[in-house]
Amino acid sequence: MSQGSQVHIFLGAPVAPLKTTVSQGTASLMSTANAWEKVRLFYKQHSLYLKAGDQEFKNLEDCQVPKGLGPPGLLSGDVLTTSVRRSAQVDEDFKHSASEAQSVKSQVNLSDMTSGQMCGLGDGVQHLPEEEKDQKLQCKNKKITDEQSKNQSDPCVRNFQRDLFALDLKCAAKLDLGCCTEQMSTGTKPEPTGHRERQSQESFSDTRCEPQSEGAVRKASDQRLSAEAEFLSVLTSSQRAFLAQGNDKGQDCINKSTVNMEAEPTGSQGVRRTEGDFSKPGGDFEEESENEQSQVYSLELFSPVCPESESSHSHINPGKNLENTSSQELFSNEENLPPNELCSSHPSTANRSWSCKDDSHHSKALSEVHQVSKKPRMDSNIREAAKAVPQRVMSELKDSKKISLIKNCDSKNQKYNCLVMVLTPCHVKEITIKSGPNSGSKVPLATIVVIDQSEIKKRVVLWRTAAFGALTVFLGDIILLTDVVLYEDQWIGETVLQSTFTSQLLNLGSYSYVQPEKYSNVIANVILQDLLTYVSTKHSYLKDLPQRQPQKMNTVEFVELEQLQPDILVHAVLRVVDVTVLTEALYSYRGQKQRKVVLTVEQAQGQHYVLVLWGPGAAWYTQLQRKKDSIWEFKYLFVQRNSILENLELHTTLWSSCECLFDDDTRAISFKTKFQKNTSSFVKISDLATHLEDKYSGVVLIKAKVSELVFSAAAAQKIALNARSTLQSIFSSLPSIVYAGCAHCGSELETDENRIYRQCLSCLPFVGKKIFYRPALMTIVDGRYNTCVHVGSKMMEQILLNISPDCLNRVIVPSSEVTYGMVASDLLHSLLAVSAEPCVLKIQSLFELDENSYPLQQDFSLLDFCPDSRKLWSPGLSLRAEGTGGIPGKE
């Protein structure tokens, strides 16, 4: 057998019982000598091969797909051939399949497919002249139409068409999904030195997009975006959710801002956002607002080779930033803001503003968004001007943009503006430049496949900043691409359209809901209506795509993590379990490098989710680390699906906020009630006598009194605290029950003859030092039964209400002489007193039994602690310091 994956296509199969087989009349057209002849599709190293009987075709494009079997909307074979011809690249010299080539049609009448022979278009991908192509297509379409009329009345054919329609709809929506999320790298072919844009173009031409069978073998790290690109993707997606608000059609978006891009001398790009350009042209407000806002928020949109871009955007006014604006203020004037367009990118030395249209909930923005000005100065005149679409920007588009059909884009020295429909959207990926002065830097890249009324499919390559504009488009969207150029990819022999530094992307929305009159001042109604007519005729299946519903900002709700949906904004009350800083995941924000901060959060015990802190949210790290295991309320989080792990993750946005909840807060009480309900089935509740008799190994809740605490100090010295210990003796023992240890592993550090701490050799090069409480052996008593429980350093700190051991000598307030050590001593004295109330202890027990079930060894470890059993308590949520960062609570 041949190596590699094989797809067997049986020709001439009987009608019953398969639903998708053709009628007997159609099958009779096949040769009856070999009723079950097979066409084998071999996946080999360099291409896809077909073999029919003894005939072998050099390429998948040589085998024609029977178009007569498709539904009327698929007669052109666009979706069928696209879904069949998934790109598969495994080597540098692999050629892209015909689904991405320039207007390659693979059409054949079913009657032409005789036994042992199939007609092809020749070897490889053919680029025919437009006139010759049109003549051939007309001739073949005529034959297909005749055959279609014969087969249309047959019920079996209709069943086949229906199933094929559903299949192609799915394929069209998910085409190239496996390749979209893969990180791409440039090839090793030689390239001429010159302009960086040229170098990037050639690096794209040799990118590899492996099939899913190969992608499953690849490491996930090879497919991940860099932290920089991931940050910008999340930023874009969250802004799409922020802007995707409008009327019942989901077309009009709130006017947020326009984007001004500046072309760097080396070709790098940065984002500068100004408050809406709908103000009076040339007025003081426009000029002052532009200068002010561009300095406040300058986000570098991926220029790894231009360090001066960071310095040029590093002038930030810390007093004027969006994260300092409350969420209520941020969205208070939402309903009063006018509809406007979602923006992509437009750099120019003159800071020419522009804007484009987003359609609905699923559209995404490249630019950062300003909902409210840092200084609310939108007077009545500006509000009146803001109620209409910015006429200056729209007239600029109208005056300077001449729309061309794809078939007329034939000159490499000219910029074109194309009104097209999206056939294949794509995620943002990255390529790594392997040679030249920019070697090692990564460039964001996205590729979409579009079509217009000239019936020519064309790949559009979006580079750098424009690549994130691909996140704003979806299957069936009508978009206006401006200032794109023709580029001939010499590596694969294909011509594509690619973005330039002045390219714009105007999304008119899904073709079923586009209203031409709204864009009459930008796009001629005749051109737009012509495209809509073509799409409704040739791609009518897209009409069944569900309408994307916008999300209103005033309807953002608190959600349960189990009910998360992707691509929406949510509020959530969460318990922070862990905080991790990824030191190697760096991205640029406000002119500085920031590390990616990942939180592990939960709403039910053991059900962990990921919350990533981006941009301004990274500043919460210190607070969250200090109050870990507390309950927090997060607002305006964006839900995104991880393309590698396929799980849902939470991401902070520019409008996110967080608040640590006190234990007596109604929101915290409600959270604890749900948490306790979710965890009650996992924890066994027992008394000490029953537990010792059952010899149960596991996690149990036991109600008992603490009678003694024994600390093992240095030099084999033991410090025992019990009911007979006085408050003064406990206070004097505090220096002995703390020690200086390695901040990484917690082991106690020794001192040399100069009383200098020695380094922890096992943790080098980490040399941090931290003060810890010594572990203790706690004796608990329940009636006449008692046992010993091991208490770790962290649990001792928790028992003392999170009073840090390094602040025992500090006074609580400057005017008082009461120190935290006095408070800790009083807590221990009250806990060990004879009159003390029993405590609820969460214990991990382990029994080692012999053959007679006699305990040879028993071990107990304290997992959680609640000093007052009368209070509402849930496992895993003991009494914490209430918003004081280690300061005792209200008790």
Curated annotation (Swiss-Prot):
Annotated spans, Mediates interaction with SHLD1: 695-866
GO cellular component: actin cytoskeleton; chromatin; nucleoplasm; site of double-strand break
Region (Sufficient for interaction with SHLD3 and MAD2L2) residue spans: 1-61
Polar residues: bias regions: 260-271, 342-354
Compositional bias of kind Basic and acidic residues: 192-222
Keywords: Chromosome, DNA damage, DNA repair
Gene Ontology biological process terms in this record: DNA repair; negative regulation of double-strand break repair via homologous recombination; positive regulation of double-strand break repair via nonhomologous end joining; positive regulation of isotype switching; somatic diversification of immunoglobulins involved in immune response; telomere maintenance in response to DNA damage
Region (Interaction with ASTE1) residue spans: 1-542
Cellular localisation: Chromosome
Chain positions covered by the region annotation Disordered: 184-222, 260-294, 333-357
Classification via InterPro entries: FAM35A (IPR029715), SHLD2_C (IPR031589), SHLD2_OB1 (IPR049507), SHLD2_OB2 (IPR053944)
Record's keyword annotation contains tRNA processing: no
Function: Component of the shieldin complex, which plays an important role in repair of DNA double-stranded breaks (DSBs). During G1 and S phase of the cell cycle, the complex functions downstream of TP53BP1 to promote non-homologous end joining (NHEJ) and suppress DNA end resection. Mediates various NHEJ-dependent processes including immunoglobulin class-switch recombination, and fusion of unprotected telomeres.
Family: Belongs to the SHLD2 family.
Subunit-level organization: Component of the shieldin complex, consisting of SHLD1, SHLD2, SHLD3 and MAD2L2/REV7. Within the complex, SHLD2 forms a scaffold which interacts with a SHLD3-MAD2L2 subcomplex via its N-terminus, and with SHLD1 via its C-terminus. Interacts with TP53BP1. Interacts with RIF1. Interacts with ASTE1.
PANTHER family: SHIELDIN COMPLEX SUBUNIT 2
Protein name: Shieldin complex subunit 2
Species name: Mus musculus
Upper classification of the organism: Eukaryota, Metazoa, Chordata, Craniata, Vertebrata
Gene: Shld2
